[in-house]
Amino acid sequence: MKEVRYFYVPDALHSTELPPEEARHALRVLRLGMGDELYLMDGEGLFLRAEITGQTGHRCQYAVVEELPQARAWLGHLHIAMAPTKMNERVEWMSEKATEIGVDEFSFVDCQFSERHQLKTDRVERIVVSA
């Protein structure tokens, strides 16, 4: 069975190169090479099938083969607001699971009795993208 590899590229249609972190994962970790197939997503519902056309150092170029249709079962918009807990792992787990079930948007709120008043959203964002 063929493994499907998804990569997050924010501007997938207008770009021809994977972002540095994704390129490193494709070339070094998965050891992909010229002609290998990969799937791109922009995080907003666009999915593309692409092929690696070039690699130089830590850079990976691709060509879009086709845009994949995505049927969305529910056309609503689900927004969750949550107060960060004392333990970051719980916030990360909640964000990951909520993304998996189809939550569209997150807001972190600072409540009167919140134990954590600042949250590093970059790690949570990476977890949500990978989910």
What residue ranges belong to the model's regions?
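RNA substrate-binding interface of SAM-dependent RNA methyltransferases
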Residues: 71-131
